[in-house]
């Protein structure tokens, strides 16, 4: 199972973006040429564009969901691209095939 390095954006926002046979993605296979939806995990800040996909993620006291401690299954790649653009583009990490790897301007 291939894991992609953590995505870090120009403004400091970071998240895991995965697609493989064990991830919540579509297609749910290893090494697809292109994915239509991917799994986001554990962003370092709450991101409104992905909140509707949040699963679990409860705080230590169990009272409220914590968006930074959650997995976001089956997020459309177009939404991931919007998140990257909103945060100034990628300065580090890698996204699965099908996600536009929007890089921050040099």
Which residue stretches match the model-derived regions?
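Low-complexity intrinsically disordered segments
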Residues: 47-106
């Amino acid at each position: 199972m291939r894991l992609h390095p953590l995505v870090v954006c120009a403004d400091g926002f970071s998240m895991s973006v995965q697609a493989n046979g064990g991830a919540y993605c579509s297609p749910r296979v290893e090494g697809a040429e292109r994915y239509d939806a991917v799994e986001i995990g554990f962003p370092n800040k709450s991101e409104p564009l992905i909140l509707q996909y949040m699963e679990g993620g409860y705080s230590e006291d169990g009272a409220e969901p914590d968006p930074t401690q959650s997995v976001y299954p089956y997020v459309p790649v177009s939404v991931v691209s919007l998140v990257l653009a909103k945060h100034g583009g990628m300065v580090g990490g890698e996204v699965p095939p099908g996600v536009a790897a929007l890089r921050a301007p040099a």
